[in-house]
């Protein structure tokens, strides 16, 4: 069924409680990608109603034909007084995967609302190769909110293959995180980079049912890690978890 632009905008604005319907309509508007769609979305961004501003930001996020103009509008909306609006704006900027948004997103990374900072950790995950984005993500890995630290550590450790001494140091630091999920993500990030500093943590947790640890154990028992595993045994002793890792590694030779 073909919907008019009026009908699609009506769904996006009015169906706040039906997220599936909203995003179906938003995707149709993205597919149209006309100047009319851009202008009407920009108008929504100037509304006094927060839900309308959210709708406008969601639409502008992927209008590639008007990316420069959309970025300018979205960046200005980071000063919005409603954290829910700012969160959506951050996600919209993240959709653009444009290094020109990094400085604006860096400012949002110190927002008072944790949901905004969490969104920044998502928005920058594909830009970590840029040193500015890396710095922001490493800062978010130390955030006071557990969910933000977890998201940033997951993005840096598992979603990105970018590898620098700073990233490894930040992941190693998070091995001591008070939250087990964050620490597990850090262990996986180090294991993916074949960093032997993850071995003691993984050995101590290998009997757990945690999915991240199972994946980390698979990474750290790659055939080229046997020497490091044996060094760890010399340092730590023949502990059960380490013995398990060594046996798994030898079985892969």
Question: Model features per residue range: what roles?
Answer:
Residues 20-23, 39, 54, 87-88, ...:
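Alpha-solenoid HEAT/ARM repeat scaffold
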Residues 1-12, 32-46, 65-79, 98-110, ...:
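Amphipathic alpha-helical scaffolding segments comprising HEAT/armadillo-like alpha-solenoid repeats
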Residues 17-20, 35, 50-51, 83-84, ...:
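Alpha-helix N-cap/helix-start positions at coil->helix boundaries
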Residues 122, 146, 151-158:
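Alpha-helical adaptor scaffolds
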Residues 180, 185-196, 200-253:
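Long, ordered, amphipathic alpha-helical scaffolds
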């Amino acid at each position: 069924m073909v919907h008019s632009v009026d009908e699609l905008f009506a769904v996006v604005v009015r169906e706040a409680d039906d997220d599936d319907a909203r995003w179906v309509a938003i995707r149709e508007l993205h597919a149209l990608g006309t100047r009319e769609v851009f202008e009407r979305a920009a108008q929504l961004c100037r509304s006094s109603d927060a839900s309308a501003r959210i709708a406008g930001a969601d639409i502008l996020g992927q209008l590639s034909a008007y990316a420069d103009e959309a970025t300018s509008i979205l960046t200005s909306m980071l000063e919005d007084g409603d954290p829910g609006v700012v969160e959506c704006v951050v996600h919209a900027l993240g959709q653009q995967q444009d290094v020109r948004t990094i400085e604006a997103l860096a400012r949002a990374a110190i927002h008072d609302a944790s949901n905004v900072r969490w969104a920044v950790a998502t928005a920058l995950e594909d830009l970590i190769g840029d040193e500015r984005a890396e710095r922001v993500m490493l800062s978010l890995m130390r955030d006071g909110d557990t969910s933000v630290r977890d998201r940033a550590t997951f993005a840096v450790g598992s979603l990105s293959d970018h590898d620098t001494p700073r990233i490894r140091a930040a992941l190693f630091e998070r091995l001591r995180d008070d939250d087990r999920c964050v620490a597990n993500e850090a262990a996986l990030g180090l294991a993916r980079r074949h960093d032997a500093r993850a071995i003691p943590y993984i050995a101590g947790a290998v009997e757990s049912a945690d999915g991240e640890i199972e994946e980390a154990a698979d990474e750290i028992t790659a055939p080229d890690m046997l020497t490091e595993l044996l060094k760890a045994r010399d340092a730590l002793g023949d502990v059960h978890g380490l013995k398990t890792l060594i046996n798994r590694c030898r079985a892969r030779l």
